[in-house]
């Protein structure tokens, strides 16, 4: 696998970009998660960033990437509506793993947003998408631009939802390379990694949460529910960061 030219690939139509990356992805599928990170750092352009929602399994990708690339900027888009346990988890992991945390937020405070638009998350799919655009997408786009990112690592896994089931290890999103080192990991592999490295799940894992986002759009898992149904009232799985 050789070095890839981001500018040249960005000039191609989306379908052609996917095809151009197909051979590389076929080879990346044969590598371990650690090998994928090393390959990306050697063959993809910097600057490099890692995004995290500090969700249930966040410690895995944070530890994995940070141990290979210490001091990599870790982007958190903070909506202001995260669980208290999430903010505590952020502090704990930032200290334990010595993370170079970069927090980005919407230009409007949560209270100001509610005054202007009402509770967007109660306004169906359209309202949820507007909420996500304001609180997740715009701050992430700003982060990528301000940090001059050209390669973006994230901790998505195919097993998490139907919308992620066919994601490749390497893609181009928002004009930058996006690398998903643990995309093919199952829940057992996640558990084993956490145990091996003395890491914890998010505190709400023990209370029955399989996925954690904002307080108002996250539900505990109940028998018969798919993991993706615990977010956004089952109307959608993605918050907007990993779409497009």
From Swiss-Prot:
GO biological process terms, semicolon-separated: hydrogen sulfide biosynthetic process; sulfate assimilation, phosphoadenylyl sulfate reduction by phosphoadenylyl-sulfate reductase (thioredoxin)
Lineage: Bacteria, Pseudomonadati, Pseudomonadota, Gammaproteobacteria, Enterobacterales
HAMAP family: CysH
Catalytic activity field: [thioredoxin]-disulfide + sulfite + adenosine 3',5'-bisphosphate + 2 H(+) = [thioredoxin]-dithiol + 3'-phosphoadenylyl sulfate
Enzyme class label: oxidoreductase
Protein name: Phosphoadenosine 5'-phosphosulfate reductase
GO molecular function: phosphoadenylyl-sulfate reductase (thioredoxin) activity
Functional note: Catalyzes the formation of sulfite from phosphoadenosine 5'-phosphosulfate (PAPS) using thioredoxin as an electron donor.
InterPro entries: PAPS/APS_Rdtase, PAPS_reduct_dom, PAPS_reductase_CysH, Rossmann-like_a/b/a_fold
UniProt source species: Salmonella schwarzengrund (strain CVM19633)
Cysteine disulfide partners in this protein: none
Gene Ontology CC: cytoplasm
Active site as annotated: 239
Keywords for the protein's UniProt record, in alphabetical order: Cytoplasm, Oxidoreductase
Known pathway: Sulfur metabolism; hydrogen sulfide biosynthesis; sulfite from sulfate: step 3/3
EC number(s) on file: 1.8.4.8
Compartment list: Cytoplasm
Entry's family note: Belongs to the PAPS reductase family. CysH subfamily.
């Amino acid at each position: 696998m050789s070095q890839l030219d981001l500018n040249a690939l960005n000039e191609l139509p989306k379908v052609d970009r996917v095809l151009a990356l197909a051979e590389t992805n076929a080879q990346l599928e044969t590598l371990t998660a650690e090998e994928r990170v090393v390959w990306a750092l050697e063959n993809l352009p910097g600057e490099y960033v890692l995004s995290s929602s500090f969700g249930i399994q966040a410690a895995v990708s944070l530890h994995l990437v940070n141990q290979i690339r210490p001091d990599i900027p870790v982007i958190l888009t903070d909506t202001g509506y995260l669980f208290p346990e999430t903010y505590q988890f952020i502090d704990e992991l930032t200290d334990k793993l010595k993370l170079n945390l970069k927090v980005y937020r919407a230009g409007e405070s949560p209270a100001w947003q509610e005054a202007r638009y009402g509770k967007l998350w109660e306004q169906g799919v359209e309202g949820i998408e507007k909420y996500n655009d304001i609180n997740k997408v715009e701050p992430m786009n700003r982060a990528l631009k301000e940090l001059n990112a050209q390669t973006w690592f994230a901790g998505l896994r195919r097993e998490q939802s139907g919308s992620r089931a066919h994601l490749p290890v390497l893609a181009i999103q928002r004009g930058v390379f996006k690398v998903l080192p643990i995309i093919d990991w199952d829940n057992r592999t996640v558990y084993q990694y956490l145990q091996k490295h003395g890491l914890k799940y998010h505190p709400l894992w023990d209370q029955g949460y399989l996925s954690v986002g904002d307080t108002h759009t996250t539900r505990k898992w109940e028998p018969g529910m798919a993991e993706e149904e615990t977010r956004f009232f089952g109307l959608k799985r993605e918050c907007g960061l990993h779409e497009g």
